[in-house]
Amino acid sequence: MFLRRRRVRRLTVVATLFAALAAVAAGPAGAIPDRTPSARPPLVEPIDPQRWRNPDDMTWADYRAVPGTRWADPDVEPTQRTFKGALVLLDYPDEEFTVSQPAGSTLFGNPQPSASGIPRDRLPQFYEDFLNKPGTLNNGHTINEYWMEDSGGRIGVDLTAFGVYRMPSKSYQYGVEDSMNPGACPTGDTCGKDIRADAKAAWTADAGAEETGKFDFVFYLAAGQDESSTWQEFGQMKFADRQDVPAVWGPPVPIGSGSNAAATRYVPWTSWQAAARIWPNATDGSSLQTESSGMAVYAHELSHILGIGDNYNNPYGTPLSRAYTGIWGMLSRGTFNGPGGPHTRWQIPATAGGSMGAQHVLRDKLKLGIVDEKNVLRLDRDTLKDSGLAVARVTARSAPPGEKGLAGVNITLGSDLSPSCDRKTDPLCDGGGYDNYTVEVVDRMGMDSFTPDNGVLISKTKNKDQAPFAWVIDAHPEDIDMVDFQRPDGTTQKITMGDYRQLSDALFHAGADSGSQYEYTDKANRLHFYVLDLKRDRSGVLSYTIAIRSLDGSGPQRRGVDLDRGVVRGNPSKGRATCTFDLANTGRAGNAGARLGSDVYRLSASATGRGWSAWLPNQLATAKAGTSVDVGVAVTAKSGADRHGKVVLTARSESDPRKTAKATCALRTR
């Protein structure tokens, strides 16, 4: 037995119990509880516990820098292109910039004390610096930094500010639109005016057509609040019903209904003052924002300018749909990320919710051309059944994967074989028609610092921007049961099934008893996904080993598995001991490539003997053909347990379930 095992090349992996325990530190949101020296350690200690965080509870202390990078440094040049943007400031006859006013003086309670009383002639430089120069007010984070990190240093953003230009019409004449706010235009006024046309005319008259033509894109920055960040906070969160909205929150002159409330994009009513605001948007090389629009809004709108669409739902719609990529993607509600959560997005200056958006999901990075193909493993569903399963280590998307590392995996489907479902009746229906699966890793680091969790993100994606064009597979599809806000009458409002925060616990985690899932099977599309283990390197970069297997074939490789008897370490009668087994892949890979030469094994363990218990930290293991790995089983003995016990470990090949092995670990109390 020993001699035969020596012919098998050994491999050290994090699947061992001790390395896995060290990997618990991979979760920045939590750590192993403190113990007194006399405390008996628990048998169950998950290697990758899910401890998701509510964005409402986050602060700037949650930000973690990406090791070895300095994307916010203006001296770091992008490797491909710097996009030159004009930042054009606009105000109105009835509204000047909020940050020029005394702290807390506006109807909305802005500006915050951090920025107030700024003279009008200093506003262009103030906002140019706030958005794109690292400083105290923006906590050292910029739009340029976002795109440098998101693209791995490929593209950057440079801004030049102009203005302030006084618009010829009042603020609400631009903000009230028939599509979102029907019937909300004050009597005698004309609404739905084209602020871009008026802004471009004013800017061109000042700077000249030659100057305005030098830029790749234009950010129009208008004074005041935006509707997206105020409709809920200054609507149903503040007033019990539309009849309760007082005149101070109503129009300056009556609207046709005589109400102080007005319709808004997602719900039937909000206060008129909230509804009369501009909703940020992008078209034809320019985007429109306001003072309450955080840095993430600019990153979101620039994505549109670069040629990619929205991927979000109406969380209050009829029929109701689950969020698409939600909190995990810039083109979904990841735009809302930032300390304090979505209900702080009304604040000016915008340093809370909406100030640091999530990275783009892998599908969107591929479309934007901001991830290197050499760092993406391309697989095909039909090819997998002939090649056998693929095993790969994927680096967290916020960190550079290096020359040979992977930023993610894309599996081409050819066609989506999922059974049809009805989005009109089923909120969890993805609508079908997907072209791919993607697998990537999220860590709460860099621009993903204000996502709620670290783990593996699995998504179905489409090649065309036909929303939903990316759909996250939710490890917890059930209602997350999260409080949204307290209504004015004191009752609690939970988030809807369509709210993006339903996906806060969507990530997959490695190991047993994590609180999440470590595998996902799409029977219709004949694919099985595994999360095998995790590792955080010395610098702090997180990665996961994942595998994808076809349900229709295991490839030409000869499969095999063998186990050596276990070796116990520690005293099970005084606490938690470990039985370590040597698991060998005795198969042959043949001519399979580096990522196709492994197998995945499903493990089970049982203890015999009165008072003895066993627990597997990881019920999956992987090894390349011709190599072996250690598998740890945690064991403990209660007081009064039999003097002798036994743990039996069973390993079964996922590629060929006929290939199994068993081994025993002999135990005794001391």
PLM regions with names:
Residues I32-R51, T98-G104, D121, Q243-N281, ...:
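Non-catalytic C-terminal accessory/binding modules of secreted extracellular proteins
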Residues G640-T669:
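Terminal connector regions
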Residues L288-Q289, G309-D422:
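A domain-level signal for the mature, folded cores of soluble proteins
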Residues F2-A31:
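Secretory targeting and sorting signals
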Residues P93, M445, N585-A589, S639, ...:
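Short, acidic/polar linear motifs in exposed loop/turn regions
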Residues K574-F581, V629, A641-V648:
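Short, solvent-exposed loop/turn segments enriched in Ser/Thr/Gly
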Residues S613-S639:
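Intrinsically disordered, low-complexity Pro/Gly/Ser/Thr-rich segments with frequent PxxP/GP/PP motifs
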Residues I32-W328, S332-P342, A352, G640:
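Active-site-proximal segment of zinc-dependent metalloprotease catalytic domains
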